[in-house]
A protein has these predicted regions:
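Surface-exposed, charge/polar-rich loops and edge strands
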Residues: 1-411
Length: 411
């Protein structure tokens, strides 16, 4: 049973929503974040990356940096940039990219569900990345970056979402990257009750994106439980901000690979090794964008090759059978020497939103070989999570990204 509850939201005043809404904090490096905040001073990135308010030489993890995030947020509330909605309710958040809309239910998910495995994960997290968000949430006393969750389709939830969207939205704007964002507030008490009950029927929800944010929110909750052992079970810190989407609405883009060198091999040797695993077509003039599972594009020596996995090569396993796993375990590791893609500096990952031309550009600039992938499917992701297994790094690329700063959950 999934506990997905309504909450009291701090949200932008309607006239400031488009200015405040920001891409996730980890999309930017330090220099990019500072540049973005300088050109968009009301962007939530100023709060999400508070070091942007300090000199470049400042320690971005110093206590005063996190305190600045808290002060700036409270000042924006005081100035009217944000409004505090006292009503506990759900919101709908629709994002439309390339004429494809997806609508999530904005809510608070249970920390206990995360701990007990009702909320299923498919990625490892790195402790050093968690620490920054733990401090940010704890000092802010609020969560601002929603966790992107998925659930298997529920007919009644689809009906309720469609009904609620007949009302006028609170926000309706197009961000600089061309994504349309619309938000509705659920006003009906009966609808709130029914949404909650429908989620309670679900055996599981799934983290699609935001594993580090989720882990950080949970660790803050566990810390506060230790500090406040008499706090009620429904204390706000026992829940974390999330947006839940029916998995059949979601688009997964591929995560492509680029490698720094050929590990001492010639191009001819690499093609020979590839032919042991794949049916190789090429050289080709046109870039290869894989159209089916088991197809990989390889850019080598300024030209493309179309690789199609041979029968019997793919292991019958939810993780080892993923295209990204087959490429890693049977080619990148033994042939190109990429033993651990999490730590090896010779490999980089390029989100599918940037297109295959970016792979050509990287190879012309500093890399020697690139691989365009067919995207992991939602069914593959759910199967891995249901089995309690973890995917290799950079297996999925979800677009569009949820904006931070539109919904704030105070702890």
């Amino acid at each position: 049973m999934a506990v997905v509850r309504p909450f009291s939201c701090v949200r932008p005043a309607a006239e400031h929503a488009a200015e405040i809404a920001a891409l996730p904090y980890d999309v930017y490096n330090r220099e990019e974040a500072k540049r973005e905040v300088k050109s968009h001073p009301l962007s939530f990135l100023a709060i999400d990356r508070p070091e942007t308010g300090f000199p470049d030489t400042a320690d971005m993890y110093a206590p005063e940096v996190y305190a600045h995030a808290k002060d700036l947020f409270e000042q924006w509330v005081k100035d009217g940039n944000y409004v505090e909605d006292p009503n506990e309710t759900y919101y709908l958040y629709e994002l439309t990219m390339n004429d494809h809309p997806q609508t999530g239910i904005v809510a608070c998910s249970s920390v206990d569900d995360y701990v007990n495995g009702v909320i299923k994960k498919h990625e490892n997290t790195r402790e050093e990345k968690e620490l920054d968000r733990i401090r940010h949430i704890d000092v802010m006393d609020a969560q601002s970056g929603p966790i992107f969750l998925a659930y298997r389709p529920v007919k009644r939830l689809k009906e309720l979402v469609a009904l609620a969207k007949e009302e006028n939205p609170l926000y309706n704007f197009i961000s600089e990257d061309g994504i349309r964002h619309r938000v509705w507030k659920i006003g009906s008490g009966d609808m709130i009750k029914e949404i909650r009950e429908e989620f309670e029927k679900l055996p599981a929800t799934y983290i699609a994106d935001g594993h580090h944010r989720a882990a950080s929110a949970v660790k803050v909750a566990l810390k506060r439980r230790a500090e406040h052992p008499d706090a009620p079970k429904d204390a706000p810190f026992n829940y974390f901000l999330s947006v839940l989407f029916s998995e059949d609405e979601l688009t997964i883009l591929p995560y492509n690979r680029v490698v720094w060198d050929l590990n001492g091999h010639s191009e001819e040797e690499l093609l020979k090794e590839a032919s042991k695993l794949f049916e190789v077509s090429g050289p080709l003039k046109e870039a290869v964008e894989p159209k089916e599972r088991g197809e990989v594009g390889m850019y080598l020596g300024g030209t493309w090759y179309d690789l199609k996995l041979k029968a019997g090569v793919r292991p019958d396993d939810p993780v080892k059978g993923l295209d990204v796993s087959v490429l890693q375990e049977k080619f990148l590791a033994p042939v190109l020497g990429i033993g651990d893609p999490r730590t090896d500096k010779r490999i980089d990952f390029v989100g599918g939103i940037r297109g295959v031309k970016e792979l050509e550009r990287r190879c012309e600039a500093d890399m020697k070989i690139a691989f365009s992938m067919y995207p992991t499917s939602m069914e593959e992701l759910l199967s891995v999570a249901d089995a309690g297994l973890l995917m290799p790094p950079k297996s999925t690329c979800f677009e569009p990204k949820l904006r931070s700063g539109i919904f704030i959950h105070r702890l």
